[in-house]
UniProtKB/Swiss-Prot annotation:
Taxonomic lineage of the native organism: Bacteria, Pseudomonadati, Pseudomonadota, Alphaproteobacteria, Hyphomicrobiales
Keyword Ribosomal protein appears in the UniProt entry: yes
Protein name: Large ribosomal subunit protein bL9
GO MF term set: rRNA binding; structural constituent of ribosome
Keywords on record: Ribonucleoprotein, Ribosomal protein, RNA-binding, rRNA-binding
């Protein structure tokens, strides 16, 4: 089916373009959401009359989206989840979880605006894209951690694979081993390796 796009649609075309799409995509998505009109002679005339109004609305929506984009550009949300010692999550962080985290901070974003290829399944800082308007995308980060303290460590760039207590214990063990090891010691004859 041929349709006339009333707004920019990702991976399809710009406003005003005449594009051929599958019938189901047009009937179930583009037409009901007001993103396109069937490409009939009457609708082509209708589009020409609506063109200036549509462009003005698009410019206003883009300006509003730019304000939201400026507010959230580089924003970091924290999601707390249970995870194994290796950093694998018990479950995953989905688009819904990210939207909930944004809403908790007072930023209203719909699930369809979050561009996430696959759910997040590991602890760490993950970069994602948010499409606040078909022509305006902004990068944000999602920090997934076991606790708020761990999230702060991740955001500071610290390595969370080893815990601070483990590092202190290792340093003490090395110091204790140094007390028992004499670098100037000479091997006794009894301790000489046997040559064969």
């Amino acid at each position: 089916m041929e349709v006339i796009l009333l707004e920019r649609v990702a991976k399809l075309g710009q406003m005003g373009e005449l594009v051929r799409v599958k019938d189901g995509y047009a009937r179930n998505f583009l037409l009901p959401r007001g993103k396109a009109l069937r490409a009939t002679a009457a609708n082509r005339d209708k589009y020409e009359h609506m063109k200036a109004d549509l462009e003005a609305r698009n410019i206003a929506a883009k300006a509003e989206a730019a304000k939201v984009a400026e507010k959230i550009d580089g924003h970091n949300v924290i999601v707390i989840r249970q995870a194994s010692e290796t950093g694998q999550l018990f479950g995953s962080v989905s688009v819904r979880d990210i939207v909930t985290s944004f809403e908790a901070e007072g930023v209203m974003i719909s699930r369809s605006q979050i561009l996430l290829d696959a759910p997040i399944k590991t602890i760490g800082k993950h970069a994602i894209e948010v499409a606040v308007h078909p022509e305006v995308e902004v990068g944000v980060s999602v920090t997934v951690a076991r606790s708020a303290e761990e999230a702060e460590r991740i955001n500071r760039g610290e390595d969370i694979s080893t815990r601070r207590e483990d590092q202190d214990a290792a340093a003490e063990a090395i110091a204790a081993a140094g007390e028992f090891f004499d670098p100037d010691a000479v091997q006794d004859d009894e301790e000489q390796p046997v040559e064969q």
